[in-house]
A protein has these predicted regions:
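A beta-strand signature from Gram-negative outer-membrane beta-barrel systems
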Residues: 123, 133-135, 144-189, 778
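Gram-negative outer-membrane beta-barrel transporters
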Residues: 390-395, 400, 467-472, 578-591, ...
C-alpha cells in the first residue's frame, strides 16, 4: 500500500473491519427468529509430543506456545493452499512470494523458512501424518503436493524441538489428514473467480464395522494475474483403515500432477508501467508425485501404545526457465572479461578500459568494458525417491504417585535423487512490457549428478508431574546423516564425495499451572540441520551456481546448530463462551547458519556458513466467541539479525557486503498482525472480515541495511457463507478489498533491460483485488 506509515495503514484497515462488523452486528441484534445455538469447537487440550500417535500431554503441561488450526477453521477460510491458511491465521507466519505464484510461497515462522525452492535455507520441518514431508534433495517443501481438502488440522510446534529431527531449527508443522470414521459423508463443490480461476472438488468418507474409507479430489485452473502465469493443479487423496478394539491400521495414497508458472521478481521501473508485467518468462515448474503411506497403532495395555509407519514417495520435478544474464564484456570483441585469476570480472567493476583483463582463452583484451545482457534457456529435471519407517512406543504410568508419560522411538529415512540440467542460447522476445526468451541453439547438458542420503534418528521425550501443578519435560534425539554425491556425466569426477554428520540434541521445559485458568512455561531446546546435497555441491565462491542449475566440487559446509530459549503464559478468561489468550518470548541462536549469497545477475551464487545469527521476538494472541461473534487477534515481533562481523559476496557490490552484529537479515519483517472476525447476521448467514498487516523488510542483497526497506502493507479481506437450504452452502471471498499495491519480497540486482544497465530494486508484486465464489453440496 503506497503512502503512509505502517501503523497508519493498519489503523485504516482496522477501521474498515470495524465498520463492516458494526453494521453486521446491528443487523444481528434483531433476528426474525430466536438465535439458534452455535456449535462450539472444544479447545485443543492434548498436545502430541511426537510425530506418531502417542500419549500426549494436556495443554497446561506443555512448555511451549503451540498453535493449532482445526477443520472448522480450514473450512471457513475457503483458501486453496496450506501456506495461505497459516499466513492468514497466525501472526508468526508470513509469506514471501518470490515466485509470484500462490502455490509456491516461501513460508516463514519466527524468521525460519519452509520453501519449495531448492537452495532456500530451510529451518522448519514438515510432517504429514507422522511422515517427514521435506524432500530428500534440498529439504524443500512443495505445498502444492498437499491436498488441502483432505487436511483435518495443523499443529505449529515452536522451537528447536529435537523430537522432530532434521531442520527443526525454529519449529515444526504437523499436518493431519481426514479419515472416514471421523469425517463421514459426501461433499461436491465448485468455485470460480478472478483471473480465470475455476475449481471442482469432492470428498467422501464412511465406515462399516471395522472398515473406514475416505477419498478426496481437487482440480483447479488459474490464468494468474501477471502476464504468462497460468497454473493447473490436480490432486487425489485416498485412505482406507481398519480399526478393531485397540488396533488401527491405515493405508494412504496421494497423487499430485501440477503445472505451476510463477514469474518471480521484476524491476520497479517495469512494474510502474505495467504491474502485471514479468521480467523474463517462462518460469515453469511441473511437479508429479505418487506417495504411499502405511501406518498403524496398537494398544498393548491401557498404559502402553505401540505405533509404526512406513512410506515411499516418487517425486519428479521439471523446470523450464528463460533467464536474462548480465556479463561484463569488451566492446571491441564482445568477449566476456576475466581477471588474472580466471574469474569473471564483477559487474561492479565493469567500466573503463579492458586493458589488463582477458577473455575465456586467456587472450588480453584491449577495448572498453561494458555490461551486456544475454538470454539463456535452462531446464532441470529432478527425480527423487524417498522412503522411511518409524517405530515408536508410548507409556504412561505413576512413579511414586506422580504421573509420567514416556515416548521413545527410532526413525530411518532414505533418499535417492538424480539431477540433470541443460542450457541453450536464446534471444529475447518482447511481449508488451514483459520479456520472454526464444531458444536459438541446442540444449547442452551441464550437470548430471546422483545423490544418496540416509538419516537415522533415535529419540525420547518424558513428561513428569512434579506436583499436580508443576510438570517437567525432558527430551533428546541422536541424529546421524550420511550423504553420497556422484557425478554421472563422467566429465566432472571431482563432484564425487561422501559426507557424514551426527549430533545429540537435548531439550528441557517446565510448565506451572499457577491458577486453573493460567499456565506459565519455559523451555530450552536444541536443533540440528545437516547441509543438503544441493548446498554441499555449491559452496565455492569461485564457481557460482545457478540454483539448482549447476553443481561443482566445493569446500565442505558445517552443520547448523540451533539453541532456543522460550518463556510464556497462556490462559482463559470468562468472556463470552471463553476467551483464550497466549503470550511468549523466544530467542533462537544459530551456529554456522547456512546462507546463499547471490553473486551473478541471473541468480548465480554459492552457499557459505555464517558463524552466528539470531531470531528473537514476542508472540501474543487472543481468540474466542461472544454470542454470534467469532474473533481472533494474533501479533508477532521478530528480530532477525546477524551476530557476527563478516563480508558476504554480492551481485551489486564488487567488494562484497560487510555485515556487523545487529544488521537485520533480509526478507524477515519485524511486525506482523492478523485480526479476524465472523458474525452470524441471520440464521445460517455468516459475514466475516480479516486484516493482514505486515511491516517492511530488508531487501535481499542488502544485508548491511544500507538501502530503504521494502514497504510494509495492510490487506483487508471479506468473506461470507450462507446455507439457503439444508446441505447446501454458498460462499464468497473478496481479497485485498482496497486494491492495495504492495510487495512481499524484494532484492537488489542489475536490470538487464535498462539503458544503461544498472542496479535496481526488484520486487514481487502482490495480487490486486480479487473475488471468488463457490457452492458446496453435502449429502
Amino acid at each position: 500500500m503506497r503512502g503512509g506509515s505502517w501503523p497508519s495503514v493498519v489503523v485504516r484497515a482496522l477501521q474498515a473491519v470495524g465498520g463492516v462488523l458494526l453494521a453486521t452486528s446491528v443487523a444481528a441484534q434483531e433476528p426474525t427468529t430466536p438465535p439458534p445455538s452455535i456449535p462450539v469447537l472444544p479447545p485443543v487440550t492434548v498436545i502430541d509430543t511426537a510425530p506418531l500417535p502417542a500419549y500426549g500431554i494436556p495443554l497446561e503441561k506443555y512448555p511451549g506456545n503451540v498453535n493449532s488450526i482445526g477443520p472448522e477453521d480450514l473450512r471457513r477460510q475457503n483458501v486453496d493452499d496450506v501456506a495461505e491458511t497459516l499466513y492468514r491465521r497466525l501472526g508468526s507466519v508470513n509469506i514471501t512470494s518470490a515466485q509470484s505464484n500462490p502455490w509456491q510461497n516461501d513460508v516463514t515462522y519466527r524468521g525460519f523458512l519452509a520453501s519449495p525452492l531448492t537452495g532456500s535455507p530451510i529451518g522448519l520441518s514438515v510432517y504429514l501424518d507422522g511422515m517427514r514431508f521435506n524432500d530428500g534433495f534440498g529439504e524443500t517443501v512443495s505445498w502444492d503436493l498437499i491436498p488441502r481438502l483432505a487436511i483435518a488440522g495443523i499443529d505449529v510446534i515452536p522451537g528447536s524441538n529435537p523430537i522432530f529431527g532434521l531442520n527443526t531449527l525454529g519449529g515444526a508443522l504437523a499436518i493431519h489428514t481426514k479419515n472416514g470414521r471421523e469425517f463421514p459423508g459426501t461433499m461436491l463443490g465448485a468455485s470460480g473467480g478472478s483471473f480465470g480461476r475455476w475449481s471442482v472438488e469432492g470428498e467422501h468418507g464412511g465406515s462399516r464395522g471395522p472398515l473406514d474409507w475416505y477419498v478426496a479430489f481437487n482440480a483447479l485452473d488459474d490464468d494468474g494475474w501477471r502476464d504468462h502465469s497460468p497454473s493447473e493443479l490436480r490432486q487425489i487423496f485416498g485412505t482406507v483403515g481398519l480399526q478393531d478394539r485397540g488396533t488401527r491400521v491405515s493405508l494412504t495414497y496421494i497423487y499430485a500432477n501440477n503445472d505451476l508458472v510463477g514469474n518471480a521478481l521484476a524491476p520497479t521501473s517495469t512494474l510502474a508501467r505495467d504491474r502485471s508485467a514479468v521480467y523474463t518468462f517462462p518460469d515453469q515448474t511441473r511437479n508429479v508425485m505418487h506417495l504411499g503411506h502405511l501406518r498403524g497403532s496398537h494398544q498393548v495395555t491401557d498404559d502402553l501404545l505401540l505405533s509404526a509407519n512406513a512410506f515411499f514417495r516418487d517425486y519428479q520435478r521439471q523446470t523450464f526457465n528463460g533467464d536474462a544474464e548480465v556479463n561484463c564484456v569488451d566492446d571491441a570483441t564482445g568477449e566476456v572479461a576475466f581477471d588474472a585469476s580466471g574469474r569473471r570480472l564483477h559487474l561492479g567493476r565493469c567500466s573503463g578500459s579492458a586493458v589488463g583483463f582477458f577473455d575465456s582463452a586467456g587472450n588480453p583484451l584491449a577495448g572498453t568494458l561494458r555490461r551486456q545482457a544475454e538470454a539463456a534457456d535452462r531446464t532441470t529435471r529432478t527425480h527423487t525417491q524417498d522412503w522411511g519407517t518409524t517405530l515408536q512406543v508410548s507409556h504412561k504410568a505413576s512413579i511414586l504417585g506422580h504421573g509420567n508419560r514416556l515416548t521413545a522411538g527410532v526413525a530411518y529415512d532414505g533418499h535417492l535423487a538424480r539431477f540433470n540440467q541443460r542450457e541453450a542460447d536464446a534471444d529475447f522476445v518482447l511481449s508488451g512490457q514483459s520479456v520472454g526468451t526464444l531458444r536459438t541453439g541446442p540444449f547442452e547438458t551441464r550437470v548430471d549428478v546422483a545423490t544418496e542420503q540416509h538419516n537415522v534418528g533415535v529419540y525420547a521425550t518424558d513428561t513428569f508431574d512434579i506436583t499436580d501443578r508443576w510438570a517437567l519435560t525432558l527430551a533428546g534425539r541422536y541424529q546421524h546423516v550420511d550423504i553420497a554425491i556422484r557425478d554421472r556425466s563422467r566429465h566432472n569426477p571431482a563432484l564425487d564425495g561422501d559426507h557424514a554428520f551426527s549430533r545429540l540434541s537435548p531439550s528441557a521445559g517446565l510448565a506451572f499451572r499457577a491458577l486453573d485458568a493460567l499456565t506459565l512455561f519455559g523451555s530450552y531446546s536444541e536443533g540440528f540441520r545437516a547441509p543438503t546435497a544441493a548446498e554441499l555441491t555449491c559452496a565455492d565462491r569461485n564457481a557460482p551456481c545457478n540454483l539448482p542449475n549447476a553443481f561443482l566440487a566445493d569446500p565442505p559446509l558445517n552443520p547448523v546448530v540451533a539453541r532456543t530459549w522460550e518463556v510464556g503464559a497462556r490462559g482463559t478468561l470468562p468472556f463470552g463462551k471463553q476467551l483464550q489468550w497466549t503470550v511468549a518470548l523466544f530467542r533462537t541462536d544459530l551456529e554456522d547458519d547456512i546462507l546463499f549469497t547471490v553473486t551473478e545477475s541471473a541468480g548465480g551464487g554459492f552457499f557459505r556458513n555464517v558463524s552466528q545469527t539470531r531470531r528473537q521476538g514476542v508472540e501474543a494472541g487472543v481468540s474466542g466467541e461472544w454470542t454470534r461473534l467469532r474473533y481472533f487477534v494474533s501479533y508477532a515481533y521478530t528480530d532477525a539479525t546477524y551476530q557476527t562481523s563478516t563480508t558476504l559476496a554480492s551481485v551489486t557490490e564488487a567488494d562484497g557486503v560487510r555485515v556487523r552484529p545487529g544488521d537485520r537479515i533480509p526478507g524477515i519483517p519485524e511486525h506482523s498482525l492478523k485480526v479476524g472476525a465472523e458474525v452470524e447476521v441471520l440464521n445460517d448467514l455468516w459475514v466475516g472480515a480479516d486484516v493482514i498487516a505486515v511491516s517492511g523488510n530488508v531487501l535481499r542483497g542488502d544485508d548491511a541495511n544500507h538501502h530503504a526497506k521494502l514497504d510494509g502493507y495492510a490487506l483487508l479481506n471479506l468473506n461470507a457463507r450462507y446455507e439457503p437450504i439444508k446441505h447446501v452452502e454458498l460462499w464468497t471471498r473478496l481479497d485485498n478489498v482496497t486494491n492495495a499495491r504492495y510487495a512481499t519480497a524484494g532484492a537488489l540486482n542489475f536490470n538487464a533491460f535498462a539503458s544503461p544497465i544498472g542496479v535496481e530494486r526488484f520486487v514481487s508484486p502482490g495480487s490486486p483485488i480479487a473475488a471468488y465464489a463457490g457452492v458446496r453440496v453435502r449429502f
